[in-house]
From Swiss-Prot:
Residues given in the record as FMN binding sites: 99-101, 128, 150, 178, 246, 301-305, 325
Function: Catalyzes the oxidation of (S)-lactate (L-lactate) to pyruvate, with a reduction of O2 to H2O2. Is likely involved in the L-lactate aerobic metabolism of S.iniae that enables the bacterium to utilize L-lactate as an energy source for growth under aerobic conditions in the absence (or at low concentrations) of glucose.
EC numbers on record: 1.1.3.-
Gene designation: lctO
Stated name of the protein: L-lactate oxidase
Cofactor(s) required, per the database record: FMN
Protein residues bound to pyruvate: 47, 152, 187, 220, 270, 273
Ranges of residues in domain FMN hydroxy acid dehydrogenase: 21-375
Textual note on the cofactor: Binds 1 FMN per subunit.
Lineage of origin: Bacteria, Bacillati, Bacillota, Bacilli, Lactobacillales
Up-regulation conditions: Induced during growth on L-lactate. Repressed by glucose.
GO MF entry, a single one: lactate 2-monooxygenase activity
Organism from which the protein derives: Streptococcus iniae
Catalytic reactions on record: (S)-lactate + O2 = pyruvate + H2O2
Length: 403
């Protein structure tokens, strides 16, 4: 028998969130998060912003961007360009939208508003299986803008085939198979808040007919837990679409995905929402990128809050960098305009970093060498890290200091 808290009738749930649409005045996305907390209902904000367990991994995701950026001058750089062409799609930036469930938790217009904002910015929109808006409406809003879909795989192959048929009919270009969320993480904030989804999930209604009023644990139990490489093979074969495997955090899992026919690897730890105590996603990126060795594209998310974070991810092997929570905060505060502004803000920061680092193009960024932070205790000591720092004490005197 289902838990009583999982049986709440959707009609009994009172839910009122933001209906904002317009320009938002904010300095950075950390400020934007504080602003959004005031307009998103407590339970919904807790679901969006919190992480698993003690939130160690959630905070490590941001802290991990500890590599040093060495400025470079005299490089002839002016007005750096973030524009790229990714598998035939011209993008304003390698910054894309990560799949985030239930946009209507943050704004009444939900995925329609976020899709409009992403389209106006000019990048890839990734729809979540747990979207609160159906596929045709999102596709219509996006028009010819690139549209990806994040797939939570059902236990029923017939339902999976039907969803894939719909994806092809709606012009979705790639499938992102999530493999790191076969069960729900220990989200204690949701438990304290008694959070249940106040809105339905039309895309997966065949295997989750009553998404509204359900806990996250219930939602995850409706999906297939025993995912294997055979599922990757089947999705690629049946859909004929590129399949990005979302969740590898080590070389072994990346290799397993490639062996199964993955067209790309999406490095993430689900924003620290699943396994607390795991490594920061940025630390995992470097290992995975080295093992993949540019055989397929790499997408990265988790902890990205600054343009310099995007720069460092690209310099560490990512081809695309995805934003999640910050976009939802922009959606809450300004609808489609707020969504677009978040991308513009971080992209402007990226351009500034590119200028100061002496990189004219995104390809230049990918060849930029980061310097490890020698004071970071999380990086094991190596003779290669044993450097000499030059200290000027007075004119014409240089002293060598070891560290």
């Amino acid at each position: 028998m289902e838990n009583k808290s999982e049986m709440i009738n959707a009609t009994t749930i009172e839910f009122k969130t933001s209906s904002a649409e317009g320009s938002v005045d904010f300095v950075n996305v950390f400020d934007l998060e504080k602003m959004a907390q005031k307009v998103i209902p407590k339970g919904a904000f807790g679901y969006i912003a919190s992480g698993a367990g003690d939130t160690f991994t959630l905070h490590e995701n941001i802290r991990s961007f500890n590599h040093k950026l060495i400025p470079h001058g005299l490089k002839g750089v002016e007005n750096p360009s973030t524009e790229i062409t990714f598998i035939g799609d011209k993008l304003a930036s390698p910054i894309i939208l990560a799949p985030v469930a239930a946009h209507k938790l943050a704004n009444e217009q939900g995925e329609i508003a976020s899709a409009k904002g992403v389209k106006e910015f000019g990048t890839i929109y990734t729809t979540s299986s747990y979207s609160t808006t159906d596929l045709p409406e999102i596709s219509q809003t996006l028009g010819d803008s690139p549209h990806w879909f994040q797939f939570y795989y059902s236990k029923d192959d017939g339902i999976n085939r039907h969803i894939m048929d719909r994806l092809k009919a709606e012009g979705v270009k790639s499938i992102v198979l999530t493999v790191d969320a076969t069960v729900g993480g220990n989200r204690e904030v949701d438990k304290r808040n008694g959070f249940v989804f106040p809105v339905g999930m039309p895309i997966v209604q065949e295997y989750l007919p009553n998404g509204a009023g359900k806990t996250m644990d219930y939602v995850y139990k409706a999906t297939k837990q025993a995912l294997s490489p055979k599922d990757v093979e089947y999705i690629a074969q049946y859909s004929g679409l590129p399949v990005y495997v979302k969740g590898p955090q080590c070389a072994e899992d990346a290799f397993r995905a490639l062996e199964a026919g993955a067209s790309g690897i999406w490095v993430t730890n689900h924003g620290g929402r699943q396994l607390d105590g795991g490594p920061a996603a940025f630390d995992s990126l470097q290992e995975v990128a080295e093992s993949v060795d540019r055989r397929v594209p790499i997408v990265f998310d988790s902890g990205v809050r600054r343009g310099q974070h995007v720069f460092k991810a690209l310099a560490s092997g990512a081809d695309l960098v995805a934003l999640g929570r910050p976009v939802i905060y922009g959606l809450a505060m300004g609808g489609s305009v707020g969504t677009r502004q978040v991308f513009e803000k971080i992209n402007d920061e990226l351009k500034m970093v590119m200028q100061l680092a002496g990189t004219q193009t995104i390809d230049d960024v990918k060849h930029f060498k980061l310097r490890h932070n020698p004071y970071d205790s999380s990086i094991p000591f190596s003779p290669k890290c044993f450097k000499i720092r030059l200290i000027f004490r007075r004119p014409n005197q240089i002293l060598g200091q070891f560290f």
